[in-house]
Amino acid sequence: NKSCSLDTITAGSKLKIDRVPEDDQNLLKYFVDNNLMPNKSITVTKSERSLGVITLNTENNTDVVFSFEIAKLIHVTKF
């Protein structure tokens, strides 16, 4: 399966994280704290383009919400 950016994914998709941006230390800490690291599984629970936010459910069953701007920087592969 081909890697693509998270902002292109629809709700209900089960994914594996391939890459997260590492140049912003605060953002990287947020990803680590929320278990959003390469090879981790996530599910897109909501993709609200009109609001500009995407909601994920992580491996440890935590909901994480962030902007499409951030989602563009995360590369994923569909299961």
Predicted regions and their residues:
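Mid-protein regulatory/catalytic core that forms ligand/cofactor-binding pockets
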Residues: N1-I70
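Short, charged, intrinsically disordered terminal tails
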Residues: F68-F79
